[in-house]
């Protein structure tokens, strides 16, 4: 294939030898790409600080036998500058990157929608105009829609009957909202504001989302995180570090299919040097 160009977001870094790094990108046209940045750890590196997590960059790469090689980089958006000095935004941003990494298992598989969703979410976080936790939960919900894991909100996940406007109960193992006739044991009963917030975040209705109270936001965060991690079959290392006021309620997952708990927060869980793979997409017509 020789040389090729693309735009991408830096998801994570991994040390390679004395001076190099493996950089994992989510790109616009080529999905997830892992490439070697030679000499990047030297103070005289021609890449400078352009290949850091959260960076939105224009790339030229050369196809290698096992890993591609980064040959040119130009910064399009340095989102990290608006995140690293703000702990809530930084940790929310790390959760975005880790989710993108986990949701893309195959390198080179197109993920245009996810890429656009990720760039929009990072722009919203770095801009500082939206609540970082709402941005994070909107991203997680809409990424699950792209992945085919969206929780049912207005209809019963089991029988498909529409609520009026919502059903009373939510079950992660069942797939979201459930009617009284289909509800399994362990289903929780979200408040009406929580249901409205779930629907608003999924649809990109920021007027409704930003008008909700702290309790609805907290409960929504718990449902979204539980639903995502059920489908990933493992916990996200970065989510417990997201500092939500009042904490996030634990949701009963019932008989979870072997959910793996990440026991080591190191190895780049928060956007540093680490091995890993992953990527994402957005919901058509729903802008962050």
Tell me what each language-model feature is.
Residues 1-22, 26-288:
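Non-catalytic alpha-helical scaffolds and adjoining flexible linkers that form interface surfaces
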């Amino acid at each position: 294939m020789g040389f090729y160009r693309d735009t991408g977001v830096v998801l994570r870094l991994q040390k390679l030898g004395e001076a190099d790094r493996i950089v994992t990108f989510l790109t616009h046209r080529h999905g997830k790409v892992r490439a070697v940045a030679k000499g990047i750890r030297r103070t005289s590196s021609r890449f400078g600080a352009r290949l850091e997590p959260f960076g939105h960059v224009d790339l030229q790469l050369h196809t290698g036998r096992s890993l591609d090689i980064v040959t040119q980089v130009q910064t399009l958006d340095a989102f990290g500058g608006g995140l690293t000095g703000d702990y809530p935004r930084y940790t929310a941003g790390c959760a975005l990157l880790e989710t993108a990494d986990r949701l893309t298992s195959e390198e080179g598989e197109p993920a245009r929608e996810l890429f656009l969703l990720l760039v929009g979410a990072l722009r919203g976080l770095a801009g500082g105009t939206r609540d970082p936790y709402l941005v994070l939960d909107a991203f997680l919900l809409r990424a699950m829609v792209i992945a085919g894991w969206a929780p049912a909100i207005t209809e019963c996940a089991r029988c498909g009957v529409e609520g009026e406007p919502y059903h009373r109960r939510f079950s992660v193992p069942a797939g979201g909202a459930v009617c009284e006739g289909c509800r399994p044991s362990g289903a929780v009963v979200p408040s009406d504001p929580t249901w409205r917030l779930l629907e608003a975040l999924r649809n990109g209705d920021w007027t409704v989302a930003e008008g909700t109270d702290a309790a609805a936001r907290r409960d929504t965060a718990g449902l979204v995180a539980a639903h995502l991690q059920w489908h990933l079959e493992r916990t996200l290392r970065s989510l417990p570090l997201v500092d939500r006021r009042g904490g996030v309620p634990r949701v009963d997952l019932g008989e979870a299919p072997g959910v793996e708990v990440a026991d080591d927060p190191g190895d780049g869980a928060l956007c540093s040097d680490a091995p890993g793979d992953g990527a994402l997409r957005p919901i058509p017509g729903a802008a962050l």
